[in-house]
Regions:
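Cytosol/nucleoplasm-facing, intrinsically disordered, low-complexity tails
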Residues: 1-67
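C-terminal helix/juxtamembrane-tail motif
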Residues: 58-61, 68, 89-92, 561-577
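N-terminal membrane-proximal hinge/A-helix region immediately C-terminal to the signal-anchor transmembrane segment
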Residues: 74-215, 225, 229, 251-256, ...
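Cytochrome P450 heme-thiolate monooxygenase catalytic core
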Residues: 96, 100, 202-211, 245-406
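Conserved cytochrome P450 K-helix E-x-x-R motif and the immediately C-terminal K′/meander segment
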Residues: 144-169, 346, 350, 433-472, ...
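Central I-helix of cytochrome P450 enzymes
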Residues: 282-286, 344-349, 377-429, 448, ...
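Cytochrome P450 heme-binding "Cys pocket" and the immediately downstream C-terminal segment
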Residues: 421, 526-563
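Conserved cytochrome P450 K-helix/beta-meander segment immediately N-terminal to the heme-binding cysteine loop
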Residues: 484-508
């Protein structure tokens, strides 16, 4: 067993010859010598020999007689011949076979050990004392199963964070030579990553979402020149002078919903599905304010349903189960989702044609002075053809309806569950102190979106450089895939994280919460979405109080956290109340 001892000594001490020839060893960082494991080495060696002897004996006992004869003949002829040629003729062949097997096993162990030490040295050379993020305790199979089949993914990330008490952790995934996949829930690190110009969206991740727009490059999922063109084309629509017109439309649509729907529910003393109603209201506001398109009631319900079906398939099912894209024709649900996608594209085409028709009737060839999203898209020459214009319209519908609607629905649900908070907000809104009312409304909105974030997380990004978390001595290496889970971002290291308490935001710094992402890929329509949510909340909470009649259930699909079958009942507040 002299060879084993030589291999062991080689692993313990650095290669002196390599030090002079290879600059890799010539690093300024002092590397500790490995401890003496001679006792452990002898124990492993003896244990391996004992195991080999027992294994060989058991194999021989179980071999058929004719195989035993062949095995003995192999030992006597071939092994004896090789041992004679190597000068080991006096050693029994069976001992040589056991030695060879033992040598291979010990060589594998030593090589693995040396490789591990080399990796540690290289890591120390590159990153110093900063370690990679810790692994989540969830095993590989559980991680894959949850990501592919479960609608409880946000709570899975939250549990992973709680298990190891860390807001940053790695996921165990079975991809050889693949980039590291890291969940990041630390607010400062998330901001640094998203604001870095080298951070880009992961194209494989967003390819499925792009299927909603039939795979055409668009403002939401694309990178590079096409995204810059789309962003530059629609940005003028969100200038303050144009937002005022959108706010006015938001007020009109809200009043119309109150008069035609909410009062009807109250007159009949019946409850209503808050999620469904907010989706229809948001869709109506968006189409009129952004696309100058007034929807009929039947069309409103139909497009709302088609949008939900297409979003669930392409932004969740197909994203997490790639086989559905290849073999989806065999599934009725996929065929239905593709039909919904076609209908959404037809609807977007109608919006585009409707705008052009109005422009022709007005006998105008100039760009409208009151720029809307549709006028920016239709009149811009930055688009190659109408397919890209239609794709951007569809993506505005996808990104601007359900997220905003369920933010409203969840906040109203929490206010109904917390009548004291609702009463304080109503008193502030009906009082004479506008600043206090605005601040309290902001706090309620922040707390509602913190407790019930409308999206499960910020989509996967690929980092363009190493990011260091100095407080935790953690490094996220260049090329890693980053995911920002909302429930970790909004709950980790927060006192009473499951409690709806808007007062926590009074002394909280502005940087403590990301509502609409940040950096160059932030939400282009965030000003319109915030204005809509703020106005609807203020209008409803000032004059009405709500009661929860059915909590329903929570579901994560199409990238949105939805309240399903959640029903509220409204009651008008008397002036003297």
């Amino acid at each position: 067993m002299a060879t084993h001892s030589w291999l062991y000594e080689l692993a313990r001490s650095p290669n002196k010859q390599a030090e002079s020839q290879n600059a890799w060893y010539q690093i300024s960082i002092s590397l500790p010598t490995l401890p003496d494991f001679s006792d452990e080495f002898e124990l492993v060696k003896n244990g391996a020999n004992s195991l080999l002897n027992q294994t060989c004996a058991e194999i021989e006992e179980r071999l058929p007689n004719e195989w035993k004869e062949n095995y003995d003949a192999f030992e006597e002829v071939h092994v004896a011949k090789w041992s004679t040629e190597l000068g080991m003729g006096n050693i029994p062949p069976r001992v040589i076979v056991k030695f060879m097997v033992s040598f291979l096993l010990m060589s594998y162990c030593v090589i693995s050990y040396v490789s591990k030490i080399n990796r540690r040295r290289r890591h120390k050379m590159l990153y110093g004392n900063n370690a990679y993020p810790p692994y989540a305790r969830a095993g590989m199979m559980k991680t894959i199963r949850t990501m592919m089949t479960s609608s409880q993914l946000p709570w899975f990330f939250k549990q992973c964070s709680e298990d190891i008490n860390s807001s940053v952790f790695r996921l165990r995934l079975p991809f050889a030579n693949a980039p590291m996949v890291v969940a990041v829930g630390d607010i400062d690190t998330v901001k640094e990553i998203l604001q870095d110009p080298g951070t880009i969206k992961s194209e494989p991740h967003f390819a499925s979402i792009a299927s909603i727009a039939a795979g055409v490059p668009n403002i939401l999922t694309s990178e590079g020149p096409q995204w810059k063109k789309s962003r530059k084309a629609v940005s003028p629509a969100f200038m303050k002078k144009h937002l005022d017109r959108m706010h006015h439309i938001c007020r009109e649509e809200t009043e119309d919903w109150i008069n035609n729907k909410l009062k009807r529910f109250m007159d009949k003393d019946v409850d209503f599905n808050i999620g469904t109603e907010m989706v229809l209201l948001t869709l109506s506001i968006l189409c009129r304010s952004a696309f100058d398109y007034e929807m009929k009631p039947k069309e409103l319900k139909a497009i709302g349903a088609e949008l939900s079906i297409a979003s669930k398939e392409f932004a969740f099912n197909e994203l997490n189960r790639p086989f559905r894209a290849r073999f989806g024709i065999l599934l009725s649900s996929v065929r239905r989702a593709r039909l919904a996608r076609t209908r959404l594209q037809d609807f977007a085409k109608n919006i585009l044609q409707g705008y052009r028709k109005k422009k022709r009737l007005a006998n105008s060839t100039a760009v409208s002075t009151e720029e809307t999203i549709i006028s920016c898209i239709a009149d811009s020459k930055k688009y190659e053809d109408d397919s890209q214009r239609i794709a951007d319209i569809v993506m505005f519908l996808f990104a601007g309806v359900e997220n905003t609607a369920y933010s409203l629905a969840w906040t109203l649900f929490e206010l109904a569950n917390n009548p004291k908070v609702a009463y304080d907000l109503r008193s502030a809104l009906n009082g004479n102190k506008d600043m206090r009312a605005q601040e309290m409304l902001k706090d309620v909105l922040r707390e509602g979106m913190r407790l019930r974030p409308p999206v499960s997380g910020i989509g996967i990004r690929t980092v363009g450089r190493d990011f260091y978390m100095d407080k935790k001595s953690i490094v996220i290496p260049k090329g890693s895939q980053i995911f920002v889970p909302s429930l970790v971002l909004t709950r980790f290291d927060v006192k009473d994280p499951e409690t709806f308490r808007p007062s926590r935001w009074r002394d909280h710094p502005e940087k403590s919460f990301l509502l609409f992402s940040t950096g160059r890929r932030n939400c282009v329509g965030q000003s319109l979405a915030l204005a809509e949510i703020t106005w609807v909340l203020s209008r409803l909470c000032a004059k009405y109080e709500f009661e929860v009649t059915s909590k329903g259930s929570t579901e994560y699909s199409s990238g949105t956290m939805k309240c399903l079958k959640t029903r509220l009942k409204a009651q008008c507040i008397k002036k003297n109340k």
